[in-house]
Design a protein with these regions (language model features):
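Elongated alpha-helical scaffolds that mediate protein-protein interactions in large eukaryotic proteins
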Residues: 3, 51, 111-115, 121-125, ...
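Lectin-like carbohydrate-binding module/patch detector with strong preference for beta-trefoil
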Residues: 1-239, 335
Length: 381
């Protein structure tokens, strides 16, 4: 991503691969405000905004997080309820989305695509396995009156048709014609006050399957993308450390030392509190934005992920010990990575009561690590 520093623009390469895309945009037409366009990050709201389409929280395993359901409550402000709409057969980047136009839905924090599998189950699929046939959906304004005729392509960015917060959208799978709906809750779930309903595809569905769309704020969608790249990198790092502990030869272990080091520095800066000399209103706005970032990261399980990284590195008593197992380069970076992990942990909970409360149960565990390792002394407190 891009950031400003010392009056110039910098590319921070640690968050994600440094790939750039060139997108054609029609300069002869305008994009209507408040209408859906390709590439938007949004939430799919059901039932007068009481529920939204989402996946299980970060505390669940990877396989369970492939399932999709409708959930009410605070999830409507969590990153795991964000989706990116990617149009198929793009003429102009960011053009208006029409009724019946094929698109794919990519879940922001996992990077996986909503897919209808051969057995008619609805799951998130890895990018590499997400073929167009299984992942192509479209919006319909009604289940009865389908626009099945061939529509003439409109020059430029197209006509605005689907309005945020206003248009009622039914989601149809392009290849099978099935509709996105929900599995009716059983009596036991109703009695227990369950707030989740499994999302499924059906040839009829329910009368109230219509969804309204809510566009994500730029800061929110940016943070969600940072979460995705960070989770991917840290999990890769943990898998590498686990492989080392099983005494696999270091030459066969994928241990992204440099990427983790750079990412940690970027993240520490990302959560740095605003300068004290700022005007009061500007400072308060930045503090609110910082707290929102902290909350989004915590809700996706990032505090626990940082603790897992610390726990794996604490298996080694010194840089020399780590170097014996992982190699000279890794040994030289052991101390700085461990210190940066403690610093990031502090940045994630600093000034945030909710995150401090969530972390409090791990405090004794952390202090025992701090006391044992001189490399990390003083970094948290």
């Amino acid at each position: 991503h891009l950031s400003y520093g010392n009056g110039s623009l910098h590319v921070d390469a640690a968050f994600q691969q440094t790939l750039w895309s060139v997108a054609p945009i029609s300069s002869g037409s305008e994009v209507a405000q408040g209408y859906l366009i390709g590439g938007d990050v949004l939430r799919l709201l059901h039932g007068h905004m009481d529920e939204c389409l989402t996946v299980p929280s970060g505390e669940h395993g990877e396989e369970q997080r492939r399932t999709v359901h409708y959930e009410g409550g605070a999830v409507s402000i969590h990153a795991r309820s964000l989706w990116r709409l990617e149009t198929l057969r793009v003429a102009w980047s960011g053009s208006h989305i029409r009724w019946g136009q094929p698109f794919r839905l990519r879940h922001i924090t996992t990077g996986k695509y909503l897919s209808l599998l051969d057995d008619k189950s609805l799951l998130l699929t890895d990018k590499e396995k997400a073929d167009v046939k299984s992942t192509a959906f479209c919006f319909r304004s009604s289940k009865e009156k389908l626009d099945i005729g061939t529509r003439k392509e409109v020059d430029g960015m197209g006509a605005p048709e689907i309005k945020y917060g206003d248009s009622i959208c039914f989601i149809q799978h392009v290849d099978t014609g099935l509709w996105l709906t929900y599995q009716s809750a059983d009596a036991k779930s109703v009695r227990m006050g369950s707030v989740q309903r499994k999302a499924i595809m059906h040839h009829e569905g329910h009368m109230d399957d219509g969804l309204t769309l809510s566009r994500s704020q730029n800061e929110e969608s940016r943070t969600a993308r940072v979460i995705r790249s960070t989770v991917f990198l840290f999990n890769r790092f943990i898998r590498g450390l686990d492989a080392l502990s099983k005494k696999v030869k270091s030459s066969t272990v994928d241990l992204p030392i440099e990427s983790v080091s750079l990412s940690l520095q970027d993240l520490i800066g990302y959560f740095h509190p605003p300068d004290e000399h700022l005007e009061h209103e500007d400072k308060q706005n930045r503090l609110r934005a910082l707290k929102n970032r902290q909350n989004l990261f915590q809700e996706e399980g990032m505090i626990n992920l940082v603790l897992e990284c610390i726990d794996r590195l604490n298996v080694y008593s010194s840089a020399a010990h780590f170097a014996d197992v992982a190699g000279k380069e890794a040994g030289e970076a052991w101390k700085s990575i461990l210190n940066s992990l403690y610093e990031l942990l502090a940045a994630l909970i600093r000034g945030n009561r909710k995150n401090c409360a969530q972390f409090s149960g791990s405090l004794d565990w952390l202090i025992s690590r701090l006391e044992r390792l001189e490399a990390s002394s003083g970094m948290l407190f």
